Amino acid sequence: MVSSTTPSSGEYLLEMSGINKSFPGVKALDNVNLKVRPHSIHALMGENGAGKSTLLKCLFGIYQKDSGTILFQGKEIDFHSAKEALENGISMVHQELNLVLQRSVMDNMWLGRYPTKGMFVDQDKMYRETKAIFDELDIDIDPRARVGTLSVSQMQMIEIAKAFSYNAKIVIMDEPTSSLTEKEVNHLFTIIRKLKERGCGIVYISHKMEEIFQLCDEVTVLRDGQWIATEPLAGLTMDKIIAMMVGRSLNQRFPDKENKPGEVILEVRNLTSLRQPSIRDVSFDLHKGEILGIAGLVGAKRTDIVETLFGIREKSAGTITLHGKKINNHNANEAINHGFALVTEERRSTGIYAYLDIGFNSLISNIRNYKNKVGLLDNSRMKSDTQWVIDSMRVKTPGHRTQIGSLSGGNQQKVIIGRWLLTQPEILMLDEPTRGIDVGAKFEIYQLIAELAKKGKGIIIISSEMPELLGITDRILVMSNGLVSGIVDTKTTTQSEILRLASLHL
């Protein structure tokens, strides 16, 4: 509902002032402010659990604030649903896209508000209006295409176009580039800047510092439910923002390298996946205590390497040798028995059971080993091992019965890593291990990885973040179009050299 209080000066499109919100035993927001100007891109930053989501839920009426005021275009607002917010010009593009995959693009654009001709939907008008918006935003998508046939990046464009169709003045974007290629990211940034030119205020949420400095004008930082600062980005450094987010200065983004790679424990020769296009003739060694990175552009088939090693993909040729003995992993169970573990890329869809507790999520990969002599589960051992995961991985949680979906991304990832360590692996493979994780939690994950390498684990890390690979690995294997284009020593290589190798077979 929009009230008719006195308009503000007009300097801001959106003013959230002194917002407070409490839950039983928890002060989620404590006097928080967010002020967004027209013609601006405003970063909203903070560690997971800082209060960003709660603040936006108060804006959209999903939560009712306890106190504070929200002004939109100078008038006090009190929305009771996201639909009401959208109809009044405030839209959100979620990290998990809200589209009907079986319907056409234009159906998704106008769902619930179809243009009609008499008693029927006016398909021609719907097509024309969709096409006009796409043309204005330089979106090259057929309005009649089925959404399920599109890429993630194209789906995000549709969500943005939908916000545009509502004539949204405030557009909130939550981690919009997490699954995009560099080319797709650049196209997305072009569209965001077009919205800015039209007078929109964009609230941009991302853990990727490089994007924030490339795109945004101002930043608001939250920490532990409190407003810390709102400042122009032009006067800030990455270290300054990190210090505001975590409450202390992070003297280093990556832990010191104390691991000393030993003998070769894994030899991969001419590994080729059965179903092509995929990896072809992949060869490399992995040493005890070594952290081997895998780099490459999107489509380089990096993930196919670890999936083939883990038995998810069937190999058609090549050999896998562990401690001098040839092995074959026909499925995940065989891989686990041979000492392999895989932390998958999509944490929420393939890594965790979000609505089940930490105990279940800690033990699921090893559950058959908890049966006693009569075939019943040994609850005492299960509880003990769950507590080991919580303690050794430094998981921040009230207890092992806590639903894992309620934890931050960093703590979820720690549970997944701990789960695999219970299987006592020799080879730990991590696919995008810090995706969607805030900067403080990233450092904790890096520390865990470094500690595991120091204990002699062979570690393989796939990452799209070049600074991450250069910061924590010993060597980097570079993939290009399913082929190994080079293996480089991290100490002596450069980002430009890795990018050159990544483009070698395109």
Swiss-Prot record:
The family database entries (Pfam families) matched by this protein are listed as: ABC_tran (PF00005)
Name the EC number(s): 7.5.2.11
Q: What class of enzyme is it?
A: translocase
Q: Which GO terms describe its cellular component?
A: plasma membrane
Localisation: Cell inner membrane
Entry's Gene Ontology molecular function annotations: ATP binding; ATP hydrolysis activity
**Keywords per UniProt:** ATP-binding, Cell inner membrane, Cell membrane, Membrane, Nucleotide-binding, Repeat, Sugar transport, Translocase, Transport
Q: Where does ATP bind?
A: 46-53
Membrane topology, as annotated, equals: Peripheral membrane protein
UniProt xrefs under InterPro entries: AAA+_ATPase (IPR003593), ABC_carbohydrate_import_ATPase (IPR050107), ABC_transporter-like_ATP-bd (IPR003439), ABC_transporter-like_CS (IPR017871), P-loop_NTPase (IPR027417)
Q: Which reaction does it catalyse?
A: D-galactose(out) + ATP + H2O = D-galactose(in) + ADP + phosphate + H(+); methyl beta-D-galactoside(out) + ATP + H2O = methyl beta-D-galactoside(in) + ADP + phosphate + H(+)
Does the record carry Transit peptide as a key word? no
Every ABC transporter domain range: 14-249, 264-506
The record describes its quaternary structure and partners as: The complex is composed of one ATP-binding protein (MglA), two transmembrane proteins (MglC) and a solute-binding protein (MglB).
Query: Which family does the record claim for this protein?
Result: Belongs to the ABC transporter superfamily. Galactose/methyl galactoside importer (TC 3.A.1.2.3) family.
Q: State the protein's purpose.
A: Part of the ABC transporter complex MglABC involved in galactose/methyl galactoside import. Responsible for energy coupling to the transport system.
What is the official name of this protein in its record? Galactose/methyl galactoside import ATP-binding protein MglA
* Organism of provenance: Escherichia coli O6:H1 (strain CFT073 / ATCC 700928 / UPEC)
**What taxonomic ancestry is recorded?**
Bacteria, Pseudomonadati, Pseudomonadota, Gammaproteobacteria, Enterobacterales
